[in-house]
């Protein structure tokens, strides 16, 4: 592995599970356009997450990461974003109480559009087409037009990620993440017949919140009870897209992939001499290995 790294040095390595774009000029024009777009996240946010993950590794905090296997363009709706965020918050409250430590909340959201496949192509009724590899690459319908990798999908993925992040920031900082509100959601949940085993812990949390309220500790007096830090993550699979969103941080002078706070390499692409490891070794984001 060469010591010299750049955002495109991965191109000198073997890149598995990458789509075959028919129109390279169209692809390059699209990537050049994306490279001029604003960052989806900020380097300082990625540094904050790395610091918090250090606390996790030292046993002083707990990591909660969740979200869809793959996001889709068709299911893009504010209600779906809200519900994913809401479930993660509900889980975090219970974990915070049970573990008596901070919970680092990371969503598999706002960028999880690509899917590695065991086979590059799919055959139905003697027709062989490219396998569906996620909405950022191609469509799920089995026809030539949908299955051909389309560079325009990269821009749609960027725009959907930007909209999702905008809503997540509003939810996390605008009062939706208020601790009492989250606890009320949990109280409503435990009323169900299948949730009886959670009622005891919900009752104990309720007592703690009532005590805090009596002491004047609430969302109005303590910021941490009214908002929360929330980070995004996805698999760094489509390296052309990740390269286009890799920038030098003006504060530190280091490279960050500003498509997400945290990136990970999948089980199928973590070869030490492969393109994905080559790309990820040069960025300062927190990195996961599946």
Please place each PLM-identified region on the residue numbering.
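N-terminal basic/disordered segments at the start of proteins
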Residues: 2-62
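A generic short-segment signal for beta-strand/edge and adjacent turn/coil regions
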Residues: 28-35, 70-75, 255-260
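N-terminal ordered "arm"
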Residues: 36, 56-85
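Dynamic "connector" segments at or just before major functional cores
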Residues: 39-45, 54-55, 59-61, 69, ...
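Active-site-facing alpha/beta catalytic cores
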Residues: 76-86, 90-290
